[in-house]
Amino acid sequence: MRNAGALVTEDVLRTLVLATYLLGVKRILIMPHTNCRMAMGEEADIHALIQKEHGVDTRSLEFRTVSDQRAALITDVNRVRSYPLLNDGVVVGGAIYDVTSGKITTVDC
């Protein structure tokens, strides 16, 4: 699954519950990437950019920008690991993908 910012939302958790029970998913990897637009500015900056370039006021939406990808990743991995409705025994890990080098760096969560 992919979403803006690679953040674990309620919808992501719902989907992971379904995946672990109905599809037999046994491993989950949360992996944001470098140069992510959601980690390159403040929420207000993104709203302003969309307004300026497209004339659309998006301030009613929360984009959930990330100021520290590593910290957000650790929080999200631990959130998934501790989610009570996930199937027992699911392994959850985290890594960051460097889009320039292609390197994947695991993160101890």
Locate each region found by the language model:
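Divalent metal-coordination and catalytic microenvironments
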Residues: 1, 30, 102
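Divalent-metal-activated hydrolytic enzyme cores
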Residues: 5-11, 18-23, 37-109
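Short strand-loop junctions, especially beta-strand C-caps/beta-turns
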Residues: 3-4, 33
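Ordered, amphipathic secondary-structure segments that act as subunit-interaction surfaces
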Residues: 24-33
